[in-house]
C-alpha cells in the first residue's frame, strides 16, 4: 500500500521484500479541465501544463546538475533545460503540455526515472518540484485542476506501476489551494544509503525561474 506523503515525513527506500529500492520512477499524473458550454450541451477542454523537474546538489549545497523541460528558454540567465542528468542516472520522459484529455488513464503524464546506482558520487541530494506553466489555456492554481498527484513507484513509464511507494495528492491538499508551485521532496545520502524526505511546500511562484532560485536557496542542504 502506498504511503500518503505528509510534510516532513521520511521514508526508507525499501521494497516489500526488504531489499533496497534503487530503480524507480517519480511521476506526475493530472487531468485537463473540462468546461461545459451552452447549458451543458457541449464541452471545452482546457489544456493544463504541469512541469516536473529536479535539481541535484553536492554536500555543500552547490548545484551539480538539473532536469527541466528543454522548452524553457531562459536567454542565458539559467542553464537550458534537458531531459537527462549528466551521469545518465535520471531521465525525464518529456514535456506533457495538455494533461489527460479523456479522464484518468492511470498513467503519469510526466516521469523522471531514477537509477541510484548510477548517480555521481558528488551528488548528495536530489530535489523534485512541480510547476504550473502559464499557457494560453490555463493560468490558475492547483485547486482548479480536476486531479493532480505525484508518486514514487517501481515500474516503467509506459505501464501501470508494479508498486507505489509514496503518493502526494496535489489538487486535494488545502495548502496547495492558490499555489502554483510545489517542492515535493528530497532524495539524500545518509551513512552510505539513500533516504527520502517529503517536503510538500507550496508557493505562488508565477514562473519556474522563481522556483529554481527558491530550491537552490532553501532546499540544497
Protein language model regions, located:
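Intrinsic-disorder/low-complexity signal
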Residues: 1-221
